[in-house]
Design a protein with these regions (language model features):
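Cytosolic Rossmann-like ligand/nucleotide-binding regulatory domains
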Residues: 7, 30, 158-183
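Short amphipathic beta-strand starts and helix->beta connectors
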Residues: 133-137, 181-183
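Conserved beta-strand segments of the P-loop GTPase G domain that flank and frequently precede/overlap
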Residues: 71-72, 153, 179
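Cytosolic ligand/metal-binding cores
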Residues: 4, 12, 16-28, 32-134
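Residue-level detector of flexible, active-site-proximal loop/helix-junction positions
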Residues: 54, 124, 147, 170, ...
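Extended boundary segments
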Residues: 136-168
Length: 183
């Protein structure tokens, strides 16, 4: 079973931790605020109140054995999230995903070794704007800065033509991974 460690239990971290647990994964939730630990204790596999910047404490909790650690530490001071990310990478955690507050924070997290960095407010804003102006897009899943999966209605001019005829890869740099029809 895949194991996750979620560090920082604000709205985003709590949502990630509980969703992963509800999907059947093993989740260790960490925060330095005991009230947040008490609130989530029955909603995840384990919960611990500790300073995530301290590598020795993380090792005692077995964080090193997690398949993925998600750093969701918020606030204006990026120091805690950067130092926590560094500690996780130094310990050898396989995958470290971080929440950033802005592009500068994202750049710093990438430089200290984060495997993936998301900016939830930015991603939600982009998705909302696209959905508001397009009646042809149903869903967008950002996989990385360069790749997304998009569920969309094709233009009428594409109907009845083969993928080869359309040359979508050449013209639009798009790979079609699935086709859903009304039939």
């Amino acid at each position: 079973m895949k194991t996750f460690t979620v560090i920082g239990l604000g709205r985003f971290g709590t949502s990630v931790a509980t969703q992963l647990f509800n999907m059947g994964y093993e989740v260790l939730a960490i925060d330095k605020n005991m009230d947040k630990i008490n609130a989530i204790a029955n909603l995840v596999t384990r919960a611990a109140c500790t300073d995530a910047k301290d590598e020795s404490l993380l090792k005692q909790l077995g964080v090193k054995n997690s398949d993925c650690a998600i750093v969701c530490i918020g606030g204006d001071d990026i120091t805690d999230s950067v130092l926590t990310t560094l500690a996780l990478k130094d310990m050898g955690v396989k995958q470290v995903v971080c929440k950033a507050k802005d592009n500068m924070h994202k750049t710093v997290l990438k430089k200290v070794g984060a495997d993936n960095v998301i900016i939830p407010e930015q991603e939600a804003g982009v998705k909302a704007a696209i959905e508001l102006v397009s009646d042809r897009l149903f869903d967008i899943i950002e996989l990385s800065d360069e790749y997304s999966i998009v569920d969309a209605v094709v233009p009428n001019t594409w109907i009845g033509k083969s993928i080869m005829e359309l040359s979508v890869r050449k013209k639009y740099n798009v790979n079609i991974v699935a086709i859903k029809s009304n039939n």
